[in-house]
Amino acid sequence: WQKISCDKLPFFEKEEAFFAASNTNIKTMGKKVWIASGGKKARILFSDNYGENWQIFETPIIQGNGPQGIYSIDFFDENTGIVVGGNYAKPSENNANIAITADGGKTWDLVANGKNAGYKSCVQYIPNTQGKELMAVGITGISFSNDGGNSWKKISTEQYYSIQFIDKNSAWLSGAQKISKLSIVKLHTDSFK
């Protein structure tokens, strides 16, 4: 480990928070790192040289106070990524809580606005699905997307905080007082297009 000088770190806004309940508000890929924030601001802090220099990218995710903002970030490749979150205090609210990027996080577009299950604490691309299939979990249940995050179907009311895929057909989930293994036998992805 090597400490980075404070004068090289990005400036944080007062009351900007970094929610880590799912351990997925940071994504690394090679020399690159994306760190997602919430609270007063929902932004992406980005470095492409191991933290020597930083850029800050704004997002359209709900923000402004307390438990609002980005809770999880994932990337399929260096350009294609997704953030999820919302308002932990009002988990059924489903506006401005999912956004995708096609340019490495510089710009973000809201998706499934008003058409998703609400607050999510973790999102993951499903391996070997060419960036098309994702799962998101939270206190509002488990949701699945087969179109890169543009639309979502709630597939379970089970509450989890985090999900991590082992391979295309299996994942570990954790929640309050529980750890589970998910085995995907077959997803009928045409059934909710």
Question: What are the language-model segments listed below?
Answer:
Residues A21-N23, Q68-I70, E78, K120, ...:
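Conserved positions at the start
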Residues G86, A112-S143:
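Loop/turn-rich, solvent-exposed surfaces of beta-rich toroidal or solenoidal domains
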Residues K32-W34, N79-V83, Q130-M135, S170-W172:
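Entry beta-strands of beta-propeller and related beta-repeat scaffolds
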Residues W1-L45:
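Solenoidal tandem-repeat scaffolds enriched in leucines and small polar residues
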Residues W1-F12, L45-Q63, Y88, S92-K115, ...:
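Asp-box/BNR beta-propeller loop motif
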Residues F11-A20, Q63-Q68, N116-K120:
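Short glycine-/Asp-/Thr-/Trp-enriched loop segments that recur within the blades
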Residues A36-G39, V84-N87, V137-G138, G175-A176:
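Recurrent small/Gly-Pro-centered beta-turn motifs in extracellular repeat architectures
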